């Protein structure tokens, strides 16, 4: 009986953690729609800390962070964030979107050059 109770507690706690992460990410998207990029960055940092065991969420978090950096006219930082996505998650949907954002920034002449966005991969 104790084992069943312990398993139920673990399952419930895991579900609460997932709910908390989803809620933070949802609030980040809502703040982005309102144009509150400082709030978005804060919520994304919290979501990132809660999602360390779910690495598949990192490209989504990074893409939203890059879009906020663009809104704040921090174009080099946005380009570096997009390059991070392309380097570490090349087969993801978010890498495709990041490449499109990088190309748009280059066409708008916000890219300083390829040297400014060079990111070296880090081994986990």
Where are these regions (language model features)?
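Bacterial Sec signal peptide processing site at the extreme N-terminus
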Residues: 16-34, 46, 51
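Short solvent-exposed coil/turn linkers within tandem alpha-helical repeat scaffolds
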Residues: 48-57, 86-100
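Terminal, low-structured helical/coil segments at or just beyond the last alpha-helical repeat
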Residues: 96-124
């Amino acid at each position: 009986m104790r084992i069943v109770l312990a398993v139920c507690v673990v399952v419930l706690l895991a579900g609460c953690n997932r709910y908390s992460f989803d809620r933070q990410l949802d609030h980040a998207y809502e703040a982005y729609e309102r144009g509150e990029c400082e709030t978005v960055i804060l919520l994304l940092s919290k979501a990132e800390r809660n999602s360390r065991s779910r690495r598949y969420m990192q490209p989504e978090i990074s893409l939203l962070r890059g879009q906020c950096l663009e809104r704040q006219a921090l174009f080099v930082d946005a380009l570096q964030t997009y390059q991070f996505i392309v380097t570490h998650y090349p087969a993801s949907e978010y890498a495709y979107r990041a490449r499109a954002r990088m190309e748009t920034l280059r066409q708008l002449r916000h890219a300083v050059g390829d040297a400014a966005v060079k990111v070296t991969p880090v081994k986990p």
